[in-house]
């Protein structure tokens, strides 16, 4: 779908760009431990590798995991604005900081190579 959107000049607005907080690294929160949707949707075998690489880049850059994940997403062709679900002020701070964070080609490749597309899930199947 994304290549078609790019070819037709249609902007992409990714929903839940941090995978319900998974990419922000918040696995130890009450929400993460009780979120049945996240457990159902974000259990692909490639997910741990993606999380590890996001965390590694964030540590090396001195930024949050959320900033790295959002920066990667915003550097993808066709993406015009991720739809974040901010519930705390620092979520907005991370999203704003991600706009100015430019990942280099090696970092982009490390993240892209680890990711495997997930099957379509949810009520639109």
Model regions and ranges:
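Short, flexible segments with low predicted structural confidence
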Residues: 26, 40, 63-65, 82
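Glycine/threonine-rich phosphate-binding loop and adjacent beta-strand/alpha-helix elements that clamp
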Residues: 68
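Aromatic-lined glycan-binding groove of carbohydrate-active enzymes
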Residues: 1-32, 64
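Beta-sheet entry/capping signal
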Residues: 11, 80-82
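Short glycine/serine/threonine-biased micro-segments
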Residues: 19, 23, 83, 120
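Short, basic-rich loop-to-helix N-cap that marks the start of a DNA-contacting helix
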Residues: 86
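Hydrophobic, secondary-structure "cap" segments at the distal end of domains
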Residues: 71-72
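Terminal-tail/helix-coil boundary detector
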Residues: 7, 31-60, 75-79, 89-125
């Amino acid at each position: 779908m994304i290549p078609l959107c790019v070819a037709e000049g249609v902007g992409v607005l990714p929903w839940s760009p941090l995978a319900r907080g998974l990419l922000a690294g918040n696995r130890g929160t009450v929400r993460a431990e009780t979120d049945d949707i996240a457990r159902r949707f974000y259990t692909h075998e490639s997910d741990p590798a993606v999380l590890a690489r996001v965390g590694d880049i964030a540590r090396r850059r001195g930024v949050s995991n959320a900033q790295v994940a959002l920066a990667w997403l915003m550097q993808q062709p066709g993406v015009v604005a991720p739809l974040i679900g901010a519930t705390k002020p620092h979520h907005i701070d991370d999203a704003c900081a991600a706009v100015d964070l430019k990942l280099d080609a090696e970092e982009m490749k490390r993240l892209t190579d680890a990711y495997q597309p997930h099957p379509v899930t949810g009520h639109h199947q």
